[in-house]
Protein backbone atom coordinates (compact mmCIF):
# COMPACT_ATOMS: atom_id res chain seq x y z
CA UNK A 1 0.00 0.00 0.00
CA UNK A 2 1.46 3.36 -0.94
CA UNK A 3 1.93 5.53 2.14
CA UNK A 4 1.64 9.27 2.05
CA UNK A 5 0.85 11.93 4.58
CA UNK A 6 -2.82 12.85 4.52
CA UNK A 7 -3.15 16.44 3.39
CA UNK A 8 -6.93 16.68 3.25
CA UNK A 9 -8.17 15.08 6.42
CA UNK A 10 -11.16 17.39 6.59
CA UNK A 11 -12.28 16.71 3.03
CA UNK A 12 -15.54 14.95 2.22
CA UNK A 13 -15.95 11.24 2.52
CA UNK A 14 -12.88 10.41 4.58
CA UNK A 15 -14.69 7.84 6.66
CA UNK A 16 -13.91 4.14 6.53
CA UNK A 17 -14.38 2.70 3.05
CA UNK A 18 -15.75 -0.73 3.89
CA UNK A 19 -17.38 -2.58 1.00
CA UNK A 20 -21.14 -2.88 1.04
CA UNK A 21 -22.68 -6.16 2.11
CA UNK A 22 -23.07 -8.14 -1.08
CA UNK A 23 -26.12 -10.01 0.14
CA UNK A 24 -27.90 -6.74 0.59
CA UNK A 25 -26.66 -5.51 -2.75
CA UNK A 26 -28.09 -8.54 -4.48
CA UNK A 27 -31.46 -8.30 -2.76
CA UNK A 28 -33.06 -6.56 -5.70
CA UNK A 29 -32.59 -9.70 -7.76
CA UNK A 30 -30.60 -7.95 -10.46
CA UNK A 31 -29.31 -10.59 -12.83
CA UNK A 32 -25.86 -10.33 -14.20
CA UNK A 33 -25.63 -8.72 -17.61
CA UNK A 34 -24.76 -11.17 -20.34
CA UNK A 35 -22.26 -8.60 -21.60
CA UNK A 36 -20.37 -8.55 -18.32
CA UNK A 37 -16.99 -10.17 -18.34
CA UNK A 38 -16.75 -13.88 -17.71
CA UNK A 39 -13.71 -16.10 -17.66
CA UNK A 40 -15.30 -18.65 -19.94
CA UNK A 41 -17.08 -16.47 -22.47
CA UNK A 42 -15.99 -14.44 -25.47
CA UNK A 43 -16.44 -11.14 -23.65
CA UNK A 44 -15.10 -8.83 -26.30
CA UNK A 45 -17.18 -10.20 -29.12
CA UNK A 46 -20.56 -10.43 -27.42
CA UNK A 47 -23.10 -7.91 -28.59
CA UNK A 48 -26.47 -7.12 -27.03
CA UNK A 49 -29.71 -8.19 -28.54
CA UNK A 50 -30.23 -9.14 -32.12
CA UNK A 51 -29.24 -7.34 -35.23
CA UNK A 52 -32.64 -8.05 -36.76
CA UNK A 53 -34.03 -5.87 -39.50
CA UNK A 54 -33.53 -2.16 -40.01
CA UNK A 55 -34.73 -0.11 -37.06
CA UNK A 56 -34.87 3.50 -38.08
CA UNK A 57 -33.93 6.51 -35.98
CA UNK A 58 -37.54 7.65 -35.73
CA UNK A 59 -38.92 4.23 -34.91
CA UNK A 60 -39.61 5.02 -31.25
CA UNK A 61 -41.72 2.81 -29.04
CA UNK A 62 -41.74 4.86 -25.86
CA UNK A 63 -40.33 4.01 -22.46
CA UNK A 64 -39.87 0.40 -21.51
CA UNK A 65 -41.43 -1.02 -18.41
CA UNK A 66 -39.65 0.42 -15.40
CA UNK A 67 -38.37 3.45 -17.29
CA UNK A 68 -38.42 6.79 -15.51
CA UNK A 69 -41.39 8.90 -16.49
CA UNK A 70 -40.20 12.10 -18.14
CA UNK A 71 -41.01 15.17 -16.00
CA UNK A 72 -43.58 17.27 -17.83
CA UNK A 73 -42.12 20.53 -16.51
CA UNK A 74 -39.02 20.23 -18.68
CA UNK A 75 -39.03 22.38 -21.82
CA UNK A 76 -36.66 21.02 -24.44
CA UNK A 77 -35.03 23.50 -26.78
CA UNK A 78 -32.74 22.45 -29.57
CA UNK A 79 -29.19 23.84 -29.69
CA UNK A 80 -28.50 27.02 -31.62
CA UNK A 81 -28.21 26.58 -35.37
CA UNK A 82 -25.46 29.16 -35.83
CA UNK A 83 -22.48 26.86 -35.87
CA UNK A 84 -19.38 28.10 -34.12
CA UNK A 85 -15.85 27.64 -35.36
CA UNK A 86 -13.39 26.31 -32.84
CA UNK A 87 -9.85 25.02 -32.65
CA UNK A 88 -9.41 22.46 -29.92
CA UNK A 89 -6.13 21.88 -28.16
CA UNK A 90 -5.08 18.38 -27.27
CA UNK A 91 -3.34 17.19 -24.14
CA UNK A 92 -0.39 19.24 -22.97
CA UNK A 93 1.51 16.02 -22.33
CA UNK A 94 4.47 15.00 -24.46
CA UNK A 95 6.49 11.86 -24.03
CA UNK A 96 7.20 8.25 -24.90
CA UNK A 97 4.69 5.43 -25.05
CA UNK A 98 5.11 2.53 -22.62
CA UNK A 99 3.11 -0.70 -22.72
CA UNK A 100 2.62 -3.66 -20.38
CA UNK A 101 0.07 -6.45 -20.12
CA UNK A 102 -1.44 -8.85 -22.67
CA UNK A 103 -0.49 -8.29 -26.31
CA UNK A 104 -1.95 -11.36 -28.00
CA UNK A 105 -4.76 -9.15 -29.23
CA UNK A 106 -6.96 -11.87 -30.76
CA UNK A 107 -6.88 -13.99 -27.60
CA UNK A 108 -7.72 -11.28 -25.04
CA UNK A 109 -11.06 -12.05 -23.39
CA UNK A 110 -11.43 -15.31 -25.32
CA UNK A 111 -10.78 -18.97 -24.58
CA UNK A 112 -9.08 -19.38 -27.94
CA UNK A 113 -8.22 -17.44 -31.07
CA UNK A 114 -11.05 -17.58 -33.68
CA UNK A 115 -10.42 -19.79 -36.70
CA UNK A 116 -10.29 -16.82 -39.06
CA UNK A 117 -7.44 -15.39 -36.98
CA UNK A 118 -5.60 -18.70 -36.54
CA UNK A 119 -2.46 -17.40 -38.25
CA UNK A 120 -1.97 -14.98 -35.34
CA UNK A 121 -2.46 -17.60 -32.61
CA UNK A 122 1.10 -17.51 -31.34
CA UNK A 123 1.78 -13.81 -31.76
CA UNK A 124 2.04 -11.51 -28.78
CA UNK A 125 2.90 -12.22 -25.16
CA UNK A 126 2.23 -11.03 -21.63
CA UNK A 127 4.53 -8.14 -20.72
CA UNK A 128 4.86 -8.18 -16.92
CA UNK A 129 6.66 -4.85 -16.75
CA UNK A 130 6.86 -1.60 -18.77
CA UNK A 131 8.34 -1.79 -22.28
CA UNK A 132 9.06 0.72 -25.02
CA UNK A 133 7.91 0.06 -28.58
CA UNK A 134 11.03 -0.08 -30.74
CA UNK A 135 9.08 1.15 -33.75
CA UNK A 136 8.22 4.39 -31.93
CA UNK A 137 11.78 5.57 -31.36
CA UNK A 138 11.75 9.33 -31.88
CA UNK A 139 7.93 9.54 -31.93
CA UNK A 140 6.56 12.01 -29.38
CA UNK A 141 3.16 10.95 -28.05
CA UNK A 142 0.56 13.39 -26.73
CA UNK A 143 -2.24 11.03 -25.67
CA UNK A 144 -3.43 7.43 -25.91
CA UNK A 145 -6.84 5.73 -25.96
CA UNK A 146 -8.27 2.28 -25.30
CA UNK A 147 -11.22 0.97 -23.29
CA UNK A 148 -12.10 -1.42 -20.48
CA UNK A 149 -13.56 -3.90 -22.97
CA UNK A 150 -11.23 -3.09 -25.89
CA UNK A 151 -8.34 -5.12 -27.34
CA UNK A 152 -7.18 -2.28 -29.58
CA UNK A 153 -5.56 1.08 -28.91
CA UNK A 154 -4.82 4.46 -30.46
CA UNK A 155 -2.19 7.11 -29.93
CA UNK A 156 -2.06 10.75 -30.97
CA UNK A 157 1.33 12.30 -31.68
CA UNK A 158 2.33 15.85 -30.81
CA UNK A 159 1.62 16.72 -34.46
CA UNK A 160 -1.95 15.43 -34.05
CA UNK A 161 -1.54 12.31 -36.18
CA UNK A 162 -3.57 9.21 -35.31
CA UNK A 163 -1.97 5.77 -35.02
CA UNK A 164 -3.70 2.48 -34.15
CA UNK A 165 -2.90 -1.16 -33.41
CA UNK A 166 -4.35 -4.32 -31.86
CA UNK A 167 -7.39 -6.43 -32.69
CA UNK A 168 -9.01 -5.50 -35.98
CA UNK A 169 -11.61 -8.10 -36.92
CA UNK A 170 -14.28 -5.39 -37.29
CA UNK A 171 -12.04 -2.76 -38.87
CA UNK A 172 -11.71 -0.85 -35.58
CA UNK A 173 -8.16 0.24 -36.47
CA UNK A 174 -9.34 2.32 -39.43
CA UNK A 175 -6.85 1.06 -42.01
CA UNK A 176 -9.46 -0.10 -44.53
CA UNK A 177 -9.04 -3.81 -43.77
CA UNK A 178 -9.55 -6.31 -40.95
CA UNK A 179 -5.93 -7.42 -40.55
CA UNK A 180 -4.53 -7.43 -37.03
CA UNK A 181 -1.68 -4.97 -36.43
CA UNK A 182 0.83 -5.69 -33.66
CA UNK A 183 2.68 -2.37 -33.59
CA UNK A 184 1.33 1.21 -33.79
CA UNK A 185 0.69 2.27 -37.37
CA UNK A 186 -0.30 5.66 -38.80
CA UNK A 187 -3.83 5.78 -40.24
CA UNK A 188 -2.90 7.00 -43.71
CA UNK A 189 -6.38 8.10 -44.76
CA UNK A 190 -6.50 10.55 -41.83
CA UNK A 191 -2.99 11.98 -42.01
CA UNK A 192 -4.37 15.28 -43.33
CA UNK A 193 -6.33 15.84 -40.11
CA UNK A 194 -5.15 17.02 -36.70
CA UNK A 195 -6.60 14.93 -33.86
CA UNK A 196 -6.98 15.89 -30.21
CA UNK A 197 -8.94 13.03 -28.65
CA UNK A 198 -10.08 9.45 -29.32
CA UNK A 199 -12.14 6.71 -27.65
CA UNK A 200 -12.46 2.94 -28.04
CA UNK A 201 -15.50 0.71 -27.57
CA UNK A 202 -15.44 -3.07 -27.65
CA UNK A 203 -14.93 -3.16 -31.41
CA UNK A 204 -15.42 0.43 -32.58
CA UNK A 205 -13.53 3.71 -32.46
CA UNK A 206 -14.29 7.45 -32.44
CA UNK A 207 -11.66 10.11 -33.14
CA UNK A 208 -12.06 13.88 -32.67
CA UNK A 209 -10.30 16.52 -34.78
CA UNK A 210 -9.17 19.97 -33.68
CA UNK A 211 -12.09 21.61 -35.52
CA UNK A 212 -14.71 19.50 -33.71
CA UNK A 213 -15.41 16.84 -36.34
CA UNK A 214 -15.75 13.16 -35.41
CA UNK A 215 -14.56 10.18 -37.44
CA UNK A 216 -15.86 6.68 -36.68
CA UNK A 217 -14.80 3.20 -37.76
CA UNK A 218 -15.17 -0.43 -36.71
CA UNK A 219 -18.24 -2.45 -35.77
CA UNK A 220 -21.57 -0.77 -36.46
CA UNK A 221 -24.28 -3.42 -36.22
CA UNK A 222 -25.92 -1.55 -33.33
CA UNK A 223 -25.49 1.87 -34.96
CA UNK A 224 -22.63 2.78 -32.61
CA UNK A 225 -20.75 4.66 -35.34
CA UNK A 226 -23.57 7.17 -35.83
CA UNK A 227 -23.58 6.79 -39.60
CA UNK A 228 -27.34 6.35 -40.01
CA UNK A 229 -27.16 2.64 -40.79
CA UNK A 230 -26.27 -0.71 -39.22
CA UNK A 231 -23.55 -1.90 -41.55
CA UNK A 232 -21.81 -4.75 -39.74
CA UNK A 233 -18.28 -3.35 -40.08
CA UNK A 234 -16.82 -0.09 -41.39
CA UNK A 235 -13.03 -0.50 -41.73
CA UNK A 236 -12.37 2.93 -43.26
CA UNK A 237 -12.92 6.16 -41.26
CA UNK A 238 -16.16 8.02 -41.96
CA UNK A 239 -17.55 11.21 -40.43
CA UNK A 240 -20.60 10.70 -38.23
CA UNK A 241 -23.95 12.10 -39.36
CA UNK A 242 -24.15 15.24 -37.28
CA UNK A 243 -24.71 18.89 -38.12
CA UNK A 244 -24.74 20.59 -34.74
CA UNK A 245 -22.19 22.61 -32.82
CA UNK A 246 -18.55 21.45 -32.93
CA UNK A 247 -17.82 18.42 -30.76
CA UNK A 248 -15.34 18.77 -27.90
CA UNK A 249 -15.31 15.28 -26.31
CA UNK A 250 -16.12 11.70 -27.33
CA UNK A 251 -16.60 8.52 -25.28
CA UNK A 252 -17.44 4.90 -26.09
CA UNK A 253 -19.22 2.14 -24.22
CA UNK A 254 -19.20 -1.44 -25.44
CA UNK A 255 -21.74 -0.92 -28.23
CA UNK A 256 -22.75 2.73 -27.84
CA UNK A 257 -21.17 6.17 -28.13
CA UNK A 258 -21.43 9.62 -26.56
CA UNK A 259 -20.39 13.01 -27.90
CA UNK A 260 -20.42 16.44 -26.23
CA UNK A 261 -20.57 19.75 -28.09
CA UNK A 262 -18.95 23.09 -27.29
CA UNK A 263 -22.20 24.38 -25.73
CA UNK A 264 -22.34 21.55 -23.20
CA UNK A 265 -25.03 19.54 -24.97
CA UNK A 266 -24.81 15.74 -24.84
CA UNK A 267 -25.67 13.30 -27.63
CA UNK A 268 -25.71 9.51 -27.80
CA UNK A 269 -26.16 6.74 -30.35
CA UNK A 270 -25.89 2.97 -30.60
CA UNK A 271 -27.36 0.22 -28.42
CA UNK A 272 -29.98 1.42 -25.87
CA UNK A 273 -30.33 -1.90 -24.02
CA UNK A 274 -30.02 -0.77 -20.39
CA UNK A 275 -31.03 2.85 -20.89
CA UNK A 276 -27.38 3.83 -21.34
CA UNK A 277 -28.27 6.24 -24.15
CA UNK A 278 -30.26 8.37 -21.70
CA UNK A 279 -33.44 8.69 -23.77
CA UNK A 280 -35.86 7.28 -21.18
CA UNK A 281 -36.08 3.88 -22.86
CA UNK A 282 -34.13 0.66 -23.13
CA UNK A 283 -35.32 0.37 -26.74
CA UNK A 284 -36.56 -3.17 -26.23
CA UNK A 285 -39.45 -4.55 -28.28
CA UNK A 286 -40.84 -7.91 -29.36
CA UNK A 287 -40.10 -8.60 -33.01
CA UNK A 288 -40.96 -11.57 -35.21
CA UNK A 289 -41.21 -15.02 -33.60
CA UNK A 290 -41.23 -13.45 -30.12
CA UNK A 291 -37.62 -12.34 -30.49
CA UNK A 292 -36.47 -9.39 -28.40
CA UNK A 293 -34.78 -6.71 -30.46
CA UNK A 294 -33.56 -3.19 -29.79
CA UNK A 295 -34.50 0.09 -31.39
CA UNK A 296 -30.98 1.42 -31.84
CA UNK A 297 -30.15 5.07 -32.30
CA UNK A 298 -28.41 5.27 -35.66
CA UNK A 299 -27.50 8.96 -35.53
CA UNK A 300 -26.57 11.28 -32.69
CA UNK A 301 -29.62 12.17 -30.58
CA UNK A 302 -29.56 14.82 -27.90
CA UNK A 303 -30.10 13.88 -24.25
CA UNK A 304 -32.52 16.48 -22.97
CA UNK A 305 -33.69 15.31 -19.53
CA UNK A 306 -31.68 15.16 -16.31
CA UNK A 307 -33.30 14.20 -13.01
CA UNK A 308 -32.79 13.77 -9.29
CA UNK A 309 -34.72 11.54 -6.92
CA UNK A 310 -35.68 12.65 -3.43
CA UNK A 311 -35.61 10.38 -0.38
CA UNK A 312 -39.34 9.82 -0.67
CA UNK A 313 -38.97 8.71 -4.30
CA UNK A 314 -40.15 11.90 -5.96
CA UNK A 315 -38.62 12.56 -9.37
CA UNK A 316 -37.58 16.14 -10.06
CA UNK A 317 -36.08 17.64 -13.22
CA UNK A 318 -32.62 19.18 -12.91
CA UNK A 319 -32.41 22.31 -15.08
CA UNK A 320 -29.40 24.11 -16.52
CA UNK A 321 -27.16 21.09 -16.96
CA UNK A 322 -24.13 22.11 -19.01
CA UNK A 323 -21.97 19.05 -19.64
CA UNK A 324 -18.22 19.40 -19.17
CA UNK A 325 -16.99 15.78 -19.27
CA UNK A 326 -18.26 12.31 -20.17
CA UNK A 327 -17.17 8.74 -19.40
CA UNK A 328 -18.61 5.36 -20.40
CA UNK A 329 -18.32 1.86 -18.96
CA UNK A 330 -19.45 -1.29 -20.75
CA UNK A 331 -23.10 -0.26 -20.49
CA UNK A 332 -23.30 2.70 -18.14
CA UNK A 333 -22.49 6.38 -18.50
CA UNK A 334 -21.29 9.29 -16.35
CA UNK A 335 -21.18 13.03 -16.89
CA UNK A 336 -19.68 15.94 -15.00
CA UNK A 337 -21.46 19.27 -15.42
CA UNK A 338 -20.41 22.91 -15.06
CA UNK A 339 -21.63 22.96 -11.45
CA UNK A 340 -19.34 20.02 -10.56
CA UNK A 341 -22.30 17.66 -10.27
CA UNK A 342 -22.13 14.02 -11.37
CA UNK A 343 -24.95 12.20 -13.16
CA UNK A 344 -25.06 8.48 -13.97
CA UNK A 345 -27.38 6.18 -15.89
CA UNK A 346 -27.59 2.86 -17.72
CA UNK A 347 -27.06 -0.59 -16.24
CA UNK A 348 -27.26 -0.49 -12.45
CA UNK A 349 -25.76 -3.88 -11.58
CA UNK A 350 -23.15 -4.00 -8.77
CA UNK A 351 -23.97 -0.42 -7.77
CA UNK A 352 -21.93 1.17 -10.55
CA UNK A 353 -24.38 4.10 -10.81
CA UNK A 354 -23.85 5.11 -7.17
CA UNK A 355 -27.52 5.44 -6.24
CA UNK A 356 -27.52 2.84 -3.41
CA UNK A 357 -29.60 0.49 -5.53
CA UNK A 358 -29.08 -1.76 -8.55
CA UNK A 359 -31.90 -0.39 -10.65
CA UNK A 360 -31.20 0.56 -14.26
CA UNK A 361 -31.62 4.27 -14.95
CA UNK A 362 -33.07 5.38 -18.28
CA UNK A 363 -32.11 9.05 -18.01
CA UNK A 364 -29.17 10.81 -16.31
CA UNK A 365 -29.73 10.83 -12.55
CA UNK A 366 -27.91 13.03 -10.05
CA UNK A 367 -25.39 11.28 -7.78
CA UNK A 368 -26.25 12.91 -4.45
CA UNK A 369 -22.83 12.82 -2.78
CA UNK A 370 -21.36 15.43 -5.12
CA UNK A 371 -24.30 17.87 -4.89
CA UNK A 372 -23.10 19.83 -1.86
CA UNK A 373 -20.94 22.95 -1.49
CA UNK A 374 -17.28 21.97 -1.41
CA UNK A 375 -18.12 18.40 -2.40
CA UNK A 376 -18.27 18.82 -6.15
CA UNK A 377 -16.34 16.56 -8.50
CA UNK A 378 -13.37 17.59 -10.62
CA UNK A 379 -12.76 14.39 -12.62
CA UNK A 380 -14.81 11.31 -13.56
CA UNK A 381 -13.78 7.86 -14.81
CA UNK A 382 -15.84 4.80 -15.77
CA UNK A 383 -14.58 1.24 -15.56
CA UNK A 384 -16.17 -1.90 -16.93
CA UNK A 385 -18.44 -2.36 -13.91
CA UNK A 386 -17.45 0.53 -11.67
CA UNK A 387 -17.05 4.30 -11.48
CA UNK A 388 -14.57 6.77 -9.98
CA UNK A 389 -14.63 10.49 -9.26
CA UNK A 390 -12.02 12.88 -7.89
CA UNK A 391 -13.60 15.53 -5.68
CA UNK A 392 -12.71 19.20 -5.93
CA UNK A 393 -10.91 18.73 -2.61
CA UNK A 394 -8.76 15.99 -4.16
CA UNK A 395 -10.35 12.89 -2.62
CA UNK A 396 -10.77 9.81 -4.81
CA UNK A 397 -14.18 8.10 -4.64
CA UNK A 398 -15.22 4.67 -5.93
CA UNK A 399 -18.49 2.83 -6.44
CA UNK A 400 -19.51 -0.40 -8.16
CA UNK A 401 -17.27 -3.46 -8.35
CA UNK A 402 -13.96 -4.32 -9.99
CA UNK A 403 -14.26 -7.99 -9.06
CA UNK A 404 -17.86 -8.99 -9.66
CA UNK A 405 -17.49 -12.15 -7.59
CA UNK A 406 -16.90 -10.08 -4.46
CA UNK A 407 -18.73 -7.32 -2.57
CA UNK A 408 -20.15 -4.31 -4.37
CA UNK A 409 -19.96 -0.69 -3.26
CA UNK A 410 -23.43 0.73 -3.81
CA UNK A 411 -22.63 4.44 -3.42
CA UNK A 412 -19.47 6.61 -3.65
CA UNK A 413 -16.93 5.87 -0.92
CA UNK A 414 -13.49 7.33 -0.38
CA UNK A 415 -10.53 5.23 -1.50
CA UNK A 416 -8.54 5.32 1.71
CA UNK A 417 -5.37 3.89 0.18
CA UNK A 418 -5.02 7.01 -1.97
CA UNK A 419 -6.09 9.60 0.57
CA UNK A 420 -3.72 12.56 0.27
CA UNK A 421 -2.50 11.72 -3.23
CA UNK A 422 -3.13 14.17 -6.06
CA UNK A 423 -4.64 12.12 -8.89
CA UNK A 424 -4.09 13.43 -12.43
CA UNK A 425 -4.96 10.34 -14.50
CA UNK A 426 -6.81 7.09 -13.80
CA UNK A 427 -7.82 4.13 -15.94
CA UNK A 428 -9.76 0.89 -15.51
CA UNK A 429 -9.34 -2.40 -17.34
CA UNK A 430 -11.47 -5.52 -17.07
CA UNK A 431 -10.90 -5.61 -13.32
CA UNK A 432 -7.62 -3.73 -12.78
CA UNK A 433 -6.99 -0.08 -11.91
CA UNK A 434 -3.99 2.17 -12.55
CA UNK A 435 -3.49 5.71 -11.27
CA UNK A 436 -0.94 8.44 -11.96
CA UNK A 437 -0.63 10.55 -8.82
CA UNK A 438 2.07 13.00 -7.74
CA UNK A 439 5.42 11.49 -8.80
CA UNK A 440 4.19 7.89 -8.68
CA UNK A 441 2.19 5.34 -10.62
CA UNK A 442 -0.07 3.09 -8.54
CA UNK A 443 -2.06 0.00 -9.55
CA UNK A 444 -4.12 -2.83 -8.14
CA UNK A 445 -6.39 -5.61 -9.33
CA UNK A 446 -7.47 -9.16 -8.46
CA UNK A 447 -6.24 -12.33 -10.14
CA UNK A 448 -6.16 -13.27 -12.96
CA UNK A 449 -4.02 -10.53 -14.45
CA UNK A 450 -1.81 -10.51 -17.53
CA UNK A 451 0.84 -7.95 -16.65
CA UNK A 452 -1.36 -4.86 -16.81
CA UNK A 453 -0.41 -3.93 -13.23
CA UNK A 454 3.23 -3.54 -14.29
CA UNK A 455 4.85 -5.05 -11.21
CA UNK A 456 7.54 -6.83 -13.25
CA UNK A 457 8.85 -10.35 -13.82
CA UNK A 458 9.23 -12.57 -10.76
CA UNK A 459 6.94 -10.27 -8.78
CA UNK A 460 3.39 -10.66 -7.52
CA UNK A 461 1.03 -10.66 -10.48
CA UNK A 462 -1.99 -9.21 -8.65
CA UNK A 463 -2.88 -7.12 -5.62
CA UNK A 464 -6.16 -6.39 -3.88
CA UNK A 465 -4.70 -3.19 -2.39
CA UNK A 466 -3.09 -0.21 -4.08
CA UNK A 467 0.64 -0.70 -4.73
CA UNK A 468 3.22 1.61 -6.23
CA UNK A 469 4.56 0.37 -9.56
CA UNK A 470 8.25 0.12 -8.66
CA UNK A 471 9.24 -0.61 -12.27
CA UNK A 472 8.26 3.01 -13.01
CA UNK A 473 10.20 4.58 -10.14
CA UNK A 474 11.65 7.90 -11.28
CA UNK A 475 9.44 7.95 -14.38
CA UNK A 476 6.68 10.57 -14.49
CA UNK A 477 3.44 9.26 -16.00
CA UNK A 478 1.53 12.06 -17.72
CA UNK A 479 -1.36 9.80 -18.75
CA UNK A 480 -2.40 6.21 -18.02
CA UNK A 481 -4.90 4.20 -20.07
CA UNK A 482 -6.09 0.61 -19.78
CA UNK A 483 -7.58 -1.73 -22.33
CA UNK A 484 -9.20 -5.00 -21.35
CA UNK A 485 -5.91 -6.50 -20.18
CA UNK A 486 -3.15 -4.08 -21.17
CA UNK A 487 -1.88 -0.71 -19.97
CA UNK A 488 -0.49 2.27 -21.88
CA UNK A 489 1.49 5.09 -20.27
CA UNK A 490 2.62 8.40 -21.74
CA UNK A 491 5.92 8.87 -19.90
CA UNK A 492 7.50 12.32 -19.74
CA UNK A 493 10.91 12.63 -21.44
CA UNK A 494 11.65 16.35 -21.19
CA UNK A 495 14.98 16.17 -19.36
CA UNK A 496 18.12 14.12 -19.88
CA UNK A 497 17.36 12.38 -16.61
CA UNK A 498 13.91 11.39 -17.95
CA UNK A 499 15.47 10.03 -21.13
CA UNK A 500 18.09 8.02 -19.25
CA UNK A 501 15.44 6.40 -17.05
CA UNK A 502 13.36 5.43 -20.08
CA UNK A 503 16.37 4.03 -21.95
CA UNK A 504 16.81 1.47 -19.19
CA UNK A 505 13.39 -0.05 -19.94
CA UNK A 506 13.37 -3.01 -22.36
CA UNK A 507 12.21 -2.56 -25.94
CA UNK A 508 9.25 -4.53 -27.25
CA UNK A 509 9.53 -5.55 -30.89
CA UNK A 510 6.74 -8.06 -31.50
CA UNK A 511 6.94 -10.64 -34.24
CA UNK A 512 4.51 -9.77 -37.04
CA UNK A 513 3.13 -11.55 -40.10
UniProtKB/Swiss-Prot annotation:
Q: Which GO terms describe its molecular function?
A: small GTPase binding
RCC1 repeat spans:
94-156, 159-210, 212-262, 264-338, 339-392, 394-438, 439-492
PANTHER family from the UniProt entry: PROTEIN RCC2
Topology in the lipid bilayer is annotated as: Peripheral membrane protein
* Gene Ontology biological-process entries: cell division; chromosome passenger complex localization to kinetochore; positive regulation of attachment of spindle microtubules to kinetochore
Protein name as catalogued: Protein RCC2 homolog
Gene name of the record: rcc2
Keywords, ordered alphabetically: Cell cycle, Cell division, Cell membrane, Centromere, Chromosome, Cytoplasm, Cytoskeleton, Membrane, Mitosis, Nucleus, Repeat
Question: Pfam families, per this entry?
Answer: WD40_RLD (PF25390)
InterPro entries, per the entry: RCC1/BLIP-II (IPR009091), RCC2 (IPR028641), Reg_chr_condens (IPR000408)
What this protein is reported to do is described as: Multifunctional protein that may affect its functions by regulating the activity of small GTPases, such as RAC1 and RALA. Required for normal progress through the cell cycle, both during interphase and during mitosis. Required for normal attachment of kinetochores to mitotic spindles. Required for normal organization of the microtubule cytoskeleton in interphase cells. Interferes with the activation of RAC1 by guanine nucleotide exchange factors.
Q: SUPFAM superfamilies this protein is in? A: RCC1/BLIP-II
Bias category Basic residues: which stretches? 20-34
What does the annotation say about its assembly with partners? Interacts with RAC1. Interacts with CORO1C.
Quote the cellular component terms of the Gene Ontology held in the record.
chromosome, centromeric region; cytoplasm; membrane; midbody; nucleolus; plasma membrane; spindle
Segments of this protein annotated with the region Disordered: 1-70, 492-513
Name the domain of life this protein comes from: Eukaryota
* UniProt-annotated location(s): Nucleus, Nucleolus; Nucleus; Cytoplasm, Cytoskeleton; Chromosome, Centromere
Renumbered to this chain, the Basic and acidic residues biased-composition regions fall at 492-506
The segment annotated Required for interaction with RAC1 runs over 309-316
